[in-house]
A protein has these predicted regions:
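Glycine-rich phosphate/pyrophosphate-binding loop shared by adenosine-nucleotide-utilizing enzymes
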Residues: 3-5, 58-63, 91
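A short beta-loop-alpha structural element at the N-terminal edge
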Residues: 4-20
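Active-site rim helix/loop that mediates acceptor-substrate recognition in acyltransferases
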Residues: 28-57, 65-71
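Conserved acyl-donor/pantetheine-binding loop and adjacent beta-alpha core of acyl/acetyltransferases
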Residues: 64-95, 156-176
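Conserved acetyl-CoA pyrophosphate-binding loop and the N-cap/start of the following alpha-helix
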Residues: 102-114
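Conserved beta-strand-loop-alpha-helix junction that forms the acyl-donor binding cleft
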Residues: 103, 129-141, 157-162
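Conserved GNAT acetyl-CoA-binding A-motif
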Residues: 119-133
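Conserved acetyl-CoA-binding loop of GNAT-fold acetyltransferases
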Residues: 143-153
Length: 184
């Protein structure tokens, strides 16, 4: 069975559906309106939008949030000393989410490809991400590796502080001990 997918730039009109899908996939408290507005703004630079959504008919089936280089905060989970390019040239691949029923068809890779092209137009020469190693079948790391990503460093308990502040991990609930793979 062949389906027609409609890829387009993320806009504020998509926020409610993005939050709904993010909650289903990543857990309660992962994303709200305030965070969504902030994440969206960080993806805009020089009139170029690095965020994308994909619809099947009227159903949102995936989205990619990417922060433009120099429009995101380096934190303790960023091993900048290990990065092969200057920090100011690095975009941040914040979130790539695909509805469970639509996984395995290249949607995540296509969303990443589109964000990479936009980030390059914005001036980035590389992108970094923290991938959820406990994703089903470690699919997050597998897809990013397939798309050319390399491991920079593993970070145990990456989302622990957030879980204590209200984020509900789909695996650990409110005491998350999942590990992130920092990849570029």
């Amino acid at each position: 069975m062949s389906i027609t997918l409609n890829y387009q730039h993320l806009t504020p009109a998509d926020f409610d559906l993005i939050i709904q899908l993010a909650t289903e996939v990543h857990g309660t408290g992962y994303l709200d309106q305030k965070s969504m507005q902030d994440w969206y703004a960080k993806g805009l630079k020089n009139g170029i939008n690095a965020g994308f959504v994909v619809y099947h008919d009227q159903k949102l089936v995936g989205f990619r949030i990417t922060y433009a280089a120099q429009q995101w905060q380096i934190d303790k989970w960023c091993s900048t000393e290990l990065w092969p390019v200057p920090v100011e040239q690095v975009c941040y691949f914040k979130c790539n989410t695909v509805d469970e029923s639509y996984r395995g068809h290249g949607i995540g890779g296509e969303l990443l490809k589109r964000s990479v092209a936009a980030a390059k137009q914005q001036g980035a020469t590389a992108g970094v991400s923290h991938l959820w190693k406990q994703s089903p079948g470690n699919s997050a790391v597998k897809y990013f590796t397939k798309c050319g990503g390399i491991l920079i460093k593993d970070h145990p308990d990456r989302w622990h502080e957030l879980s204590l502040a209200g984020y509900e991990c789909p695996i650990c609930n409110n005491n998350c001990h999942c590990e992130a793979a920092e990849m570029m």
